[in-house]
């Protein structure tokens, strides 16, 4: 792969992180740098780690991962999105607010948005990337791009969501976005391959 192809691949992989970050930013409502950095770091780390894991185990597990990666990503995103949608219809007084900055949610979203990156790692092995020095550059670029796009998405979501989040039912739209990403992953794998 050329350098340009790796950067374009990194941007493509980071789009799910970007969309989830926008949804999370809408819910956060105000700039909170610590949770924003933790979220962006988690997304970047998992986007870098998953291709490495996929690359390491490609020869042994590729047929298993390729057959279910889209279902795993869809299930996780649909669960999180469905939960957010349901919570958006509860009364304000009795509702537990969905917290996209909680460690459990960040971890789950980071895994869900990086499942495709696992498959990319498998394809790296199939493309002939054979040693650690060759895989290092692509995974660092993928992690960096995902980190930056996640921060931008969070900031954008916060700025768009400020003042109008209540009127727009931010949790409803955030949930719809997560379910849509899950459906996109599922449709791409079932019908476009």
UniProtKB/Swiss-Prot annotation:
<feature type="transmembrane region" description="Helical">
    <location>
        <begin position="172"/>
        <end position="192"/>
    </location>
</feature>
<keyword id="KW-0813">Transport</keyword>
<keyword id="KW-0472">Membrane</keyword>
<feature type="transmembrane region" description="Helical">
    <location>
        <begin position="138"/>
        <end position="158"/>
    </location>
</feature>
<dbReference type="GO" id="GO:0030026">
    <property type="term" value="P:intracellular manganese ion homeostasis"/>
</dbReference>
<keyword id="KW-0464">Manganese</keyword>
<dbReference type="GO" id="GO:0140048">
    <property type="term" value="P:manganese ion export across plasma membrane"/>
</dbReference>
<keyword id="KW-1003">Cell membrane</keyword>
<feature type="transmembrane region" description="Helical">
    <location>
        <begin position="37"/>
        <end position="57"/>
    </location>
</feature>
<feature type="transmembrane region" description="Helical">
    <location>
        <begin position="8"/>
        <end position="28"/>
    </location>
</feature>
<feature type="transmembrane region" description="Helical">
    <location>
        <begin position="109"/>
        <end position="129"/>
    </location>
</feature>
<feature type="transmembrane region" description="Helical">
    <location>
        <begin position="61"/>
        <end position="81"/>
    </location>
</feature>
<keyword id="KW-0406">Ion transport</keyword>
<dbReference type="InterPro" id="IPR003810">
    <property type="entry name" value="Mntp/YtaF"/>
</dbReference>
<comment type="function">
    <text>Probably functions as a manganese efflux pump.</text>
</comment>
<keyword id="KW-1133">Transmembrane helix</keyword>
<comment type="similarity">
    <text>Belongs to the MntP (TC 9.B.29) family.</text>
</comment>
<protein>
    <recommendedName>
        <fullName>Putative manganese efflux pump MntP</fullName>
    </recommendedName>
</protein>
<dbReference type="GO" id="GO:0005384">
    <property type="term" value="F:manganese ion transmembrane transporter activity"/>
</dbReference>
<dbReference type="InterPro" id="IPR022929">
    <property type="entry name" value="Put_MntP"/>
</dbReference>
<dbReference type="Pfam" id="PF02659">
    <property type="entry name" value="Mntp"/>
</dbReference>
<keyword id="KW-0812">Transmembrane</keyword>
<dbReference type="GO" id="GO:0005886">
    <property type="term" value="C:plasma membrane"/>
</dbReference>
<keyword id="KW-0997">Cell inner membrane</keyword>
């Amino acid at each position: 792969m050329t350098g340009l192809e790796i950067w374009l691949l990194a941007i493509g992989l980071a789009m799910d992180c970007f969309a989830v970050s926008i949804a999370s930013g809408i819910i956060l409502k105000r700039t909170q740098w610590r949770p924003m950095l933790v979220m962006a770091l988690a997304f970047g780390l998992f986007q870098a780690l998953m291709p490495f894991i996929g690359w390491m185990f490609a020869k042994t597990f590729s047929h298993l991962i390729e057959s279910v990666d889209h279902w795993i990503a869809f299930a996780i995103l649909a669960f999180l999105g469905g939960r957010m949608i349901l919570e958006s219809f509860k009364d304000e007084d009795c509702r537990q607010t969905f917290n996209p900055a909680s460690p459990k949610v960040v971890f789950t979203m980071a895994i869900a948005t990086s499942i495709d990156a696992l498959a990319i790692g498998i394809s790296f092995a199939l493309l002939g990337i054979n040693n650690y020095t060759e895989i290092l550059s692509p995974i660092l670029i993928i992690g960096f791009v995902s980190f930056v796009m996640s921060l931008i998405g969070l900031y954008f979501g916060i700025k768009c969501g400020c003042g109008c989040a209540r009127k727009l039912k931010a949790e409803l739209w955030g949930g719809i976005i997560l379910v849509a990403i899950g459906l996109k992953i599922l449709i791409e794998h079932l019908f476009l391959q």
